[in-house]
Amino acid sequence: MENFAEQCLDMARSILSQNLDAIEDNGTISPFPNEVTTGQESGHAAFAIGEYFRATNEDTLDGHNLFDLAARTITAQAFSPESHEGGLAFASLGLLSFGSAKDRNPIWERLLEPTRLQLDEQLLERNDYNNHYQAFNIGKSVARYSVGLSKKDETGKLIDRFLERIEENSSSGYFDDVDSTTNKLSGTFDIYGVSSFVFIRQALQLHANINLRERKLASLRTKAEKYLKLIPDMVRQDGTGWSYGRSIGAYGQMCSISIILQAMRDGWISKTQADLYQDTVKKLFLNFFITYLNQEHGYLVIRDDERNTDPSYTNRIANFDAARYLCQWSRLIRSIGNNYPSENTPKPRKIGRFINFDKSSKKEQGLFVYQDPNSGLSFQLPLVAPNKDHIDSCDYLAFPHAPGIFDWPINKYMPIMIPELTFGDKTIIPAYYGKNCTTKVGMRNTLQFSYEQPTLITKEGVFANGIGSCKVNWAFAGGKINCEYVFKVESQIQLNRIRYSIAISAPHSTYRIGTSFTLGEEGHRAEVLKDDFQAQWKQTETVSQDPNYRTHNGKIHYIQTLERDHPLIMRKGIEYRLALSFEPDITFADA
């Protein structure tokens, strides 16, 4: 583990060395070529510099005075023309990383009086959030009290409110990144649950009141442990981790590693599970290291000609965040020491289960995870709602998310592996929620997952009352998948169009792990078993040169679409079925 800690610190040093020159004299950050700043880069830089100082106690790096750079970036974030809760929260914890009392904090000493007053005012101002922004409120509160800007500590109250919202929004105790839109379906259970717990735990570690930290850790543990139990089942043999929702890719890897290492440091993981979690961290890290790090120059790449990511993240933000995480991992690993000795490498497990995130009279939401070591088929099938800013994407659609095998374009909507039905101005998809979600073992040990939608829902996440209903049945046997969709309408209605798309991608030409899964020459081996809509396969569309068809890991080259583009009168009482099967030819990227 000591060697791992040093490796993390060396990587952090390399990444920071490549990015500190981007900090301007006024503390703003110059972007990578072909990117624009988001206004939060300075805060992320400040926190990364602070974490590096905590890990090394060094105040210079490659001739840069880290104290001056931290002061500059914190000042820039404090006076950012637009309000950025995240950037401010990161900047405030960056300040706190250099010392919890302002009279002993070298960065506070360097801040001019207008900056101090601005920080005091901004850290006091906060809105009440139901989503992951509440974690930023907690970070700001920790900084304000610990630095000594306030004698009243609101951190405990804010953490209690964060946990209460989890109870209100999830019957199973998972974090719903609720947005302010009230007319759409809630239930955005994604990686922001993990990242929120990681951020809050990191903030508490910097809190001046150790007693408060210990009191609140017990409350946080009851919820965070749910993700700790989930993550090992999500990680593929090639190390690919969280694979659905927004902001995954490198962040899916980094957040998953962080929450596991934090839990090991805090003793939340049983010693009997040391082999499982050590193996999980190793796989996640190796995938992260090879897939996202430029080995020659030592910096992170999350967006280029072949891959893409969430528009709220830039390569510059990702580099500072990666440096911060690596410094954090180095400290955590040293703190863990030999408390979790690993004796054996666990054998690959066969996994097939549905994790229920929320169940009420109105909806059920969750995640079906599947791994078959013999065939290499591994995927995550989400039944969750999209965040309002990600409605026009495939990130939350209910299909088997399996990077390299069943892929989808980032920041672009299309009906990947689900039927899309258009009735007038309403576009219907069987995603986002279900009722009567069940898993069972059928004939010949076939694992089945099914759910119903008594009310159809639009791709925007709004219930389409009065049109009809849908039943969805998935069946899995080794490396083979069958899916069936059964639609019924409440009264005669005209269907304008139905379409169903499949994406064929390739791994990144440079940044890829040789053992990552990808499609072989025989592709998906897709077959239409039943089609009451009488749709036809369109000519395969070549999209290799279109920048809108990039994934987190590589480029999509072809789109195959099954479509009926002329009207069909659907009649009450008749079931309309669409059934397909897949048996993907899975191989290694460098086979």
Which residues fall in each region the model found?
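Beta-strand-rich recognition/accessory modules
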Residues: 534-591
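Short, recurring structural edge motifs at helix starts
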Residues: 31-34, 78-79, 126-128, 184-185
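Extended polysaccharide-engagement surfaces of secreted carbohydrate-active enzymes
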Residues: 237, 241, 252-538
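An alpha-helical repeat/solenoid feature that recognizes helix-turn-helix modules
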Residues: 34-56, 81-101, 130-148, 190-194, ...
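Low-complexity, Ser/Thr/Pro/Gly-enriched N-terminal "stalk/linker" regions
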Residues: 1-65
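Extracellular polysaccharide-recognition and catalytic grooves
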Residues: 110-351
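Well-ordered mid-protein domain cores that form the structural environment of catalytic cofactors
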Residues: 64-125
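Residue-level detector of alpha-helical secondary structure
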Residues: 9, 13, 17-20, 50, ...
